[in-house]
């Protein structure tokens, strides 16, 4: 509300496992916020950075700068110079900006806490309405990865935890995607429920959608054209939910030992 109403900077943490809707929620929120600002005769810049790809301070700042200047060179500047350039762009634009750092844990593991601290304090040196808000997305609690100085700037940040999807929620997602992407009656209720049940083990919407997509591709090659249980089994055998540290943490000791034995056997 402070950002939408008068451009005051805000911060937010979005945490949760793979496929729980963190990134799509952030994108939808930013799109709705930009639309709201436009309806009230204000503009808003939204910059998304995938920190799995851009996992260094230099790479993140470069990605942000190229939002404002697509021709900004990828070498020849120190990070401090690049931050000064970013500040000038924000001052010239005279409108608030939101930076979304997706999978920020990849950045923080590379000892880039200082960049997060600097971005979080940017607005202190910017005249209104040139403010900078920060949204950080991670599978893990970002608070545990920040130093004390950085964390002090996020004391009032909004924290949202995304839990795994339930089977019923996955079923709703599958039906919604099928309604948009497939011909009517291509996916019938029993088959939709079968996909939801298969994906519910992980609570991963991305996994469920990939099974639906693969099953639909298999069904296209068949005379009937409808998704059947065999199509789903075929699709499920070729799609795997992303492995993450958060998922490994959920394994009991016996499963961890079994996984370790398999990994060592493959390595040898």
Labelled PLM ranges:
Residues 7-28:
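Walker A/P-loop nucleotide-binding motif
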Residues 6-9, 45, 53-63, 67-157, ...:
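Mid-core helix/loop region of P-loop NTP-binding domains shared across ATPases and GTPases
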């Amino acid at each position: 509300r402070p950002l939408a109403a008068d451009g005051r900077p805000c911060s937010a943490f979005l945490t949760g496992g793979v496929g729980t809707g963190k990134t799509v929620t952030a994108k939808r929120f930013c799109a709705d916020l930009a639309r709201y600002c436009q309806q009230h005769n204000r503009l808003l810049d939204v910059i998304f950075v995938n920190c799995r790809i851009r996992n260094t301070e230099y790479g993140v700042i470069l990605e942000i700068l190229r939002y404002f200047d697509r021709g900004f060179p990828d070498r020849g500047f120190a990070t401090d110079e690049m931050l000064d350039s970013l500040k000038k762009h924000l001052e010239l634009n005279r409108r608030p900006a939101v930076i979304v750092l997706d999978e920020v844990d990849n950045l923080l593991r590379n000892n880039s806490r200082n960049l997060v601290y600097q971005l979080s304090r940017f607005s202190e040196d910017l005249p209104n309405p040139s403010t900078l808000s920060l949204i950080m997305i991670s599978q893990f609690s970002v608070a545990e990865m920040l130093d004390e100085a950085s964390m002090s700037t996020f004391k009032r940040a909004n924290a949202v935890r995304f839990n795994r999807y339930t089977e019923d929620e996955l079923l709703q997602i599958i039906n919604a995607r099928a309604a948009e992407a497939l011909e009517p009656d291509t996916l019938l209720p029993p088959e939709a429920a079968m996909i939801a049940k298969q994906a519910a083990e992980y609570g991963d919407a991305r996994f469920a959608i990939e099974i639906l997509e693969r099953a639909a591709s298999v069904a296209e090659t068949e005379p009937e054209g409808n998704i059947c249980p065999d199509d789903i089994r075929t699709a499920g055998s070729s799609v795997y939910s992303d492995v993450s540290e958060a998922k490994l943490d959920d394994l009991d000791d016996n499963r961890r030992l079994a996984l370790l034995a398999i990994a060592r056997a493959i390595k040898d």
